Amino acid sequence: MASSTQMIFLLSIVGALISTASACCKSESFHNRRYARCTDLPVLNSSLHWTYSSADHSLDIAYRAPPSAPGGWVAWAINPSRLGMVGSQALVAYVDHGKVTVFTTSVDSYGPSMRKMSLSFPVWNLAGETTHGADIVIYAKLRLPWKNTTINQ
């Protein structure tokens, strides 16, 4: 059985790790881009940075994630109609010969085509870059077709 001193020490370490993890996205910066908020996402060692404009219902985002394998791709999607993958509208990026390619696609099944296609809402300023740690960052601005401030991602 652990002594109370060992338990306090263990809880202190866990607390420090949680604080470090939750502050992680706040330490990230992007070339000449600033975002009002960020969150470390619970999977894929990824983070989402965003600024929401209530004036025109637009969302300016930076999504950072490592590809699952060398030469792989990353994607961030929102589902404007329900929870779940099917029906999602995705921003996808991959690196080809040192250049990041970013495109949009609709996820209409569990085996999506990953073809370039327009989304159900306007998206502009699509861009991407790689970080020194080999993560891929997707930049985009999108206009949300609904007026609520909560989205399913």
For the regions a protein language model found, what residue spans apply to each?
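Extracellular-facing/secreted segment signature in eukaryotic proteins
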Residues: 2-153
